Amino acid sequence: MPSLTILAISGSLRARSTNTELLLALSALASEDTSIDLYDGLDRLPHFNPDLEPTEPASVMDLKRRLGEADGLIISSPEYARGVPGSLKNALDWLVSGSEFVDKPVALLSASSRSTYAFEALRTTLTTMSGRFVAEASITVPLLGRNLDAPAIAADPELSSALREALDVFCRAIGQRGAAGDE
């Protein structure tokens, strides 16, 4: 049984998204004591409306439950018009008032070296939400234009090494959080 569970969210709704493929490769590369729970419900979340919070839709409750059960969160996202995709920002808006996110270790991945604005916007949003951003585990994996699927990413020595190292750093950061909380 895995000792760590990491919720992974792709910021893209596109079929065969390079960011989703990156997360699938990360899952394939994870050690047997780490489980990657790939969330695929961004398209089922209603538009954020604070009036709906007292009677949260089932899709929102599912996201919050899965985040609450996870030891950490990894987001891999494209950049649209120098910003975060609306569907991803919508999901974060649903999480902002809950306790599930507080002090949750968070890492960011990007499949494009041209996503610096979205990366910074996400980092700002996540730290504003009281997430614990793990910069050392947040990386850009240059996949744009390479048309690689998850098995090809996982099989590539350079890419798989970078992903494994980022995941190892992230898991150690989660472990340090747990050890500090046990004291």
PLM features: residue spans?
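Glycine-rich phosphate/pyrophosphate-binding loop and the adjoining helix
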Residues: 2-7, 55, 134-183
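N-terminal beta1-alpha1 ligand-phosphate binding loop
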Residues: 2-33
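Short hydrophobic segments within beta-strands
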Residues: 9-11, 39, 109
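N-terminal first-folded block
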Residues: 35-46, 69
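N-terminal beta-loop-helix "entrance" segment that forms/cooperates
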Residues: 41-58, 148-151
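Helix-loop-strand module that forms the ligand-binding subsite of alpha/beta enzymes
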Residues: 55-130
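A generic structural motif
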Residues: 31-37, 132-133
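A general structural signal for well-ordered alpha-helical segments in protein cores
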Residues: 6, 19, 23, 60, ...
